[in-house]
Amino acid sequence: MAAADAAVSGDVPKGWRLLKLALGNRKTLIMLVFGFAAGLPYTLLIGTLNAWLGEWEIDLATIGVLSWIGLAYAFKFLWSPLVDRVRLPMLERLGRRRSWLIVCQVLLTATFIGLSLSDPRLQLGWFALVAVIGAFASATQDVVIDAWRIDVADERAPVEILSSIYQFGYRIAALIGGALALVLSERVSWPMVYAIMGGFMALTVIATLAAPDTPRDAIEREQSALRQAGAIEPRLRAIGLGIVGLGWLWAIWTVGSFMVNMLGGAVDPVTGKPPAVGDFTKLYGPWIVAATVILPAIVAATFNWLKARKGYILTADEPATSGGARAADHAYSALILPLGELVRRIGWGVIIVLGLILSYRITDNIWGSFAFPFYLTELKYTGDEVAFASKIFGVFMTMGGIAIGAAMFATIGRMPTLLIGAIVAAASNLIYADLASGAVAIDAFARFFALDTFGQDLRMVRLLIAISGENIAGGLAGAAFVAYLSSITSREFSAVQYALLSSLTFLVGSLGRAAVGEAIDQIGYAPVFRFTALIGLVAVGFVVLEWVRTAMAERRAGGGEILAADAAREAEGDTA
């Protein structure tokens, strides 16, 4: 009951108290392992893999294209209805959550073993295919673990405690998959590092076999509000869902086919060269954003318009009678309904909101995949040095940035903090531009504050200062952005709306990585860092517009309250 008391009082334990609590309860102990199982593949596939490729002299344009596997995490909500509803043959006796977890964890173990048996210099297409399979398996595992956490929560293991323990396990995995992997790479080969990580992943299957599962009946009997009188007709919803689905399928096919062609060694029949990443991004990038963001918003707005005019709505309850119909309702709730509510509540202001969401973290997302190649290959730091600076020291700097963001939010408010976060996130890229250009400004800063007198050589101090600036800015901006997303999310659709909007954060940055990698290959790191800092001004502009929009909305709301109060006083006077 200690866990329940802590959750009720709001005193969620941390650090060693949290670990002690996790080891004292079956569900919390398994949640700790599941957090590790979720964090390890993400760290290895999205971050550490780029260190391996950079050291083995894979060009940055190729690394950028391969980084598109991260889109699997951004858009895992697309197949979450399938994972939630479909029973896996021959594994059903394990339960609806454990059966999916076993498949994902076996695939992830095979992924790391498969990568360890591949040479990306000679088998890039095969290497990329294995990484793609691993990313989809990892993203699917995240969906299942999130559902399991909610399903098994009870008084002895409240969801707040389970969530904290999940984050604890995730951070342990980030240290092992990041810092430990880099340290090991200085002593053994990269293939051996990934084989060892495959062994760690295989151990998580034991926790899955020991985990309790949840019954399906209660969810399957639940009648969706989408089937009640006054809702849009299922037939029309199916048409809208089909339109949105086709847009998503086209976007996924376009990105996937380009990845296959480039990483598989295909050449342009006219030029005789590999496909140009920059040309692809300029030609298809805007259309991909239109198909995955603008088209669903238009469909959602159309349904709002029809519902307001009582067109094509149910006149009586019409419960779903098949698994396919329930899955369609679930997909509609994940893809269209959250945007529909946002459009209805904000109106045309949704254009500003979506623009802000798409651009706010772009300065971090668009070049993050090249951080390890930059440190290890360009600047010639060792794996031990990068492990300490990025994965240990950098974590504390990020936590400091988050604390600063929280303090600013409490003192100066949401929108000023959001604006400052956008500015410092863009400006932090200029620190890396200086580092890539010889660190003249960084050296001056270090000497002014005598930072090179604390037992570190100036070369290491440069890296620590750059990572400090980037991580503090990123932590501040991240805290401000999470607070902003939470503020615009409807309580009615909190989970699905937040998941959808937060996933859009990664879209533009992920699509732009390949073009950024190609640009670095051609003109070097420093000009690209300056350009990404300039791109960050787009987010600054959207924050200013959103600040104006929210101020006007608050003014209108205040005026409405005054009019209502005046009307109430007049009514009281008439009664008297």
Which ranges hold each PLM region?
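Intracellular loop-helix junctions on the cytosolic face of multi-pass helical membrane proteins
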Residues: M1-N25, S116-A128, D154-L356, V543-A576
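Intracellular juxtamembrane helix-capping segments at the cytosolic ends
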Residues: A139-A153, G475-S490
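Transmembrane alpha-helices of Major Facilitator/SLC transporters
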Residues: A72-W79, A291-A301, V386-A410, G421, ...
